[in-house]
């Protein structure tokens, strides 16, 4: 039987006392009907110490020397039940939080899919407008690499816009024809004179190059015999080497000092 008894302390935040009545064991020495006191801490916010802001002192651990082994086992079992219930509550709160996160992520995914679909439709409209502008300018519609890749996937994504296409195709065909018209107005006589002048220049250049090669080939064999003859003459008549004059050792030398007996 569990009995809740108020604490003797007049404070509102004092701990409560639970009295657990245990049955007598066969081998235990505890009397029948003995109550097991269990201290349950009260709310800390209602205590005067918590209201004043002073940190509470560490409560000394209560010695259980006055309890029998059965009472100790019952007290340990109660504490284990409280810890298990706390763990279950914490797990339940965590699971509910994860479920809420999953719901939020699914909603965000749906929003992103809708936005992606709108962008695809807008891109398709820009592609159609680009093709119409190309047809108005008299040019064939060009298929980009992005179109080739998206056709395999079944999507119509295309990189670019109508403005870039208009900038690339700004020059019409009339301007191209106006640029080519000066070349068409040149007379054939002028073209013939230009070709003859070019041919004469090339022939003169070829003649000069062959003439310089022939002159260099004629001068080289004539210079070779003279160089070889001069080399042979230097080898046959070398300059004789004269040894330096050495004067005999005598009194005329400044360092003359004979040994005197």
Curated annotation (Swiss-Prot):
UniProt record, GO biological process = adipose tissue development; angiogenesis; apoptotic process; cell differentiation; cellular response to amino acid stimulus; cellular response to fluid shear stress; cellular response to glucose starvation; cellular response to interleukin-4
Q: Per the record, which residues fall in region Basic motif?
A: 72-94
Q: Which residues lie on this side of the membrane: Cytoplasmic?
A: 1-185
Q: Where is this region: Nuclear localization signal (NLS)?
A: 76-92
Q: Which Pfam families match?
A: bZIP_2
Membrane-spanning ranges: 186-203
Q: Where in the cell is it found?
A: Nucleus; Endoplasmic reticulum
Its biological purpose is as follows: Functions as a transcription factor during endoplasmic reticulum (ER) stress by regulating the unfolded protein response (UPR). Required for cardiac myogenesis and hepatogenesis during embryonic development, and the development of secretory tissues such as exocrine pancreas and salivary gland. Involved in terminal differentiation of B lymphocytes to plasma cells and production of immunoglobulins. Modulates the cellular response to ER stress in a PIK3R-dependent manner. Binds to the cis-acting X box present in the promoter regions of major histocompatibility complex class II genes.
Name of this chain's protein: X-box-binding protein 1
Gene name as annotated: XBP1
């Amino acid at each position: 039987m569990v009995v809740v008894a108020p604490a003797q302390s007049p404070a509102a935040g004092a701990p409560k006392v639970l009295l657990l009545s245990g049955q007598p064991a066969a081998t235990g020495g505890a009397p029948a009907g003995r109550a097991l006191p269990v201290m349950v801490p009260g709310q800390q916010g209602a205590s005067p110490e918590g209201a004043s802001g002073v940190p509470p002192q560490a409560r000394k651990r209560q010695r259980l020397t006055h309890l029998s082994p059965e009472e100790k086992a019952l007290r340990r079992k109660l504490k284990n039940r409280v810890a298990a219930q706390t763990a279950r509550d914490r797990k339940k709160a965590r699971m509910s939080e994860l479920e809420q996160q999953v719901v939020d992520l699914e909603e965000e995914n749906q929003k992103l899919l809708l936005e992606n679909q709108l962008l695809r439709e807008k891109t398709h409209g820009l592609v159609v407008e680009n093709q119409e502008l190309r047809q108005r300018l008299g040019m064939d519609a060009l298929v980009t690499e992005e179109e080739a890749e998206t056709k395999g996937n079944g999507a119509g994504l295309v990189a670019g816009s109508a403005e870039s296409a208009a900038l690339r195709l700004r020059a019409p065909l009339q301007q191209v024809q106006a640029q080519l018209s000066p070349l068409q107005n040149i007379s054939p006589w002028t073209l013939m004179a230009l070709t003859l002048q070019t041919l004469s220049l090339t022939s003169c250049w070829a003649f000069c190059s062959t003439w310089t090669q022939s002159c260099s080939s004629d001068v080289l064999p004539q210079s070779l015999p003279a160089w070889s003859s001069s080399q042979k003459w230097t080898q046959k008549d070398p300059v004789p080497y004269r040894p330096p004059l050495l004067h005999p050792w005598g009194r005329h030398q400044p360092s003359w000092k004979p040994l005197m007996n």
